């Protein structure tokens, strides 16, 4: 069973690039995407992921704030 990954980045282009890279490996599956820390926080509170790929500089809630 592939590991479920949450991809978080405010840039739509970077989200797409990261997802494309992750999807090339059958051991991983992009389960969800978020455009900022608040959206990611909501997803994390409702779902379980094996890993999170996280941008640091984002509006509303940045990556470091999300980690806290």
Residue ranges and their predicted role:
Residues 1-4:
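Non-catalytic signal-transmission and effector/linker regions of two-component phosphorelay proteins
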Residues 8-9, 34, 52:
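Conserved sequence signature across two-component system core domains
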Residues 12-32:
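Two-component/phosphorelay signaling modules centered on CheY-like receiver
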Residues 36-39, 62-65:
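Acidic catalytic/metal-coordinating carboxylates
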Residues 47-51:
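Short acidic/histidine-rich motifs immediately flanking catalytic phosphotransfer sites
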Residues 55:
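Active-site residues of response regulator receiver
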Residues 58:
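Receiver (REC) domain active-site loop signature in two-component systems and cognate sites
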């Amino acid at each position: 069973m592939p590991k479920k990954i949450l991809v978080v980045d405010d840039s739509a282009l970077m989200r797409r690039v990261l997802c494309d890279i992750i999807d090339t490996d059958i051991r991983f599956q992009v389960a969800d995407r978020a455009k900022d820390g608040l959206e990611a926080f909501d997803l994390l509170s409702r779902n379980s992921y094996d890993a999170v790929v996280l941008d640091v500089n984002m509006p509303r809630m940045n990556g470091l704030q999300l980690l806290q």
